[in-house]
Amino acid sequence: MDTIESYQAVIKQVINEYAKLRPSHGNIHLEPIFDDENSRYALMQFGWDRERRVRGNLIYVSIKNNKVFIEYDGIENGITQDLVQKGIPERDIVLAFLPEFQAVGGQ
């Protein structure tokens, strides 16, 4: 398995673990979305909480130039350590949602 395939497998495993969790209130569903062809991965939430519609992403990750770009991380403790613990080196993880990484990857 090459680096990209390995990273894809780890990202999907981590997102699937979070997708099994259930929010403590409301009728909210979590749905993983995987696009291996373009190396994009997301965990979406949708449903209702106290007559208010809930929708949006909790996690959005992409792989570019052999690096894992965490584009959005709405998980309380973050997913970085989960990715590292499952084998992705810290040096290959970019916290793309931070201003200092705006120019990384040309995005």
PLM regions with names:
Residues 1-107:
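Terminal domain-initiation and capping elements
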